[in-house]
């Protein structure tokens, strides 16, 4: 549509709750979750499949997974609708209170069916911890917010919606021993047991793990704000694989205070245990009360030194989308709406010749 009308836009995002012909649709948060969807649509048009990170017998496994399989709809069809920063209503019946917003909810306009929802993390490679290392050792930092863990819990609870007792049978032998979930002293020794409980769930229900997080990467020339020639690619995390990141950081508890990954493990167990007992998740109560004196601005963060072992692949070292393709993703002058003070925007604006036509 944008191509036909010669108006600013993003590739493939024809129907959405944003108007990309207007500058206000290109703000910081808007660009960070809309550009990745346009990237996914462009990759689909080029028959380039994202890397799907999933769990296989407690180990990370990579597969190639087409965008229409991830989204469960052809993203370029007229009926595909993208609602950004929206609640995912299929989880409403599993939760007490309002379902938190997620980065994108995908629906089918033809039958009004809500199809899927994803968190999105647009990440730069290399990050500060790996910028001085060779390409094969570089990685990108990922920061996970608490609401992502809520959606992770809901995605697992949904599996047990018709049979919550199956979940209770797994969790109750350990969780019933907890007298005070807010007491760090009594909770900390239990965290390795919580990790094992979650792995038990993942082992038994491995076949039903689902994509939950889209992680586009954009590569720069070292620490410079100039895009690498091979600059863009897309990784998709399953809910179980994402959980493994904080479980790996929790399975050997810290000797001092509870860490963010450990608290995230406790959050997930508590929400699932509440669901197993009551059929509902009171996520606000869990997040607000189980703090262990840590701020709630994020669930946890993992540096490039950590994430590379989960993401290590030819695509991480050499992303498949060339930088000259960006002019086919940001179209009809949309780059003029970008804010150069932000890092990806700055790299796009600062990279010479990016939007010039190749003769």
Swiss-Prot record:
InterPro entries: Restrct_endonuc_II_HindVP. It catalyses: Endonucleolytic cleavage of DNA to give specific double-stranded fragments with terminal 5'-phosphates. One of its GO terms (molecular function) is type II site-specific deoxyribonuclease activity. GO terms for biological process: DNA restriction-modification system. Keywords: Endonuclease, Hydrolase, Nuclease, Restriction system. It holds the Pfam family RE_HindVP. The keyword Hydrolase applies. Disulfide bonds: none annotated. It is an enzyme of class 3 (hydrolase). Its EC number is 3.1.21.4. This is Type II restriction enzyme HgiDI. The gene is hgiDIR.
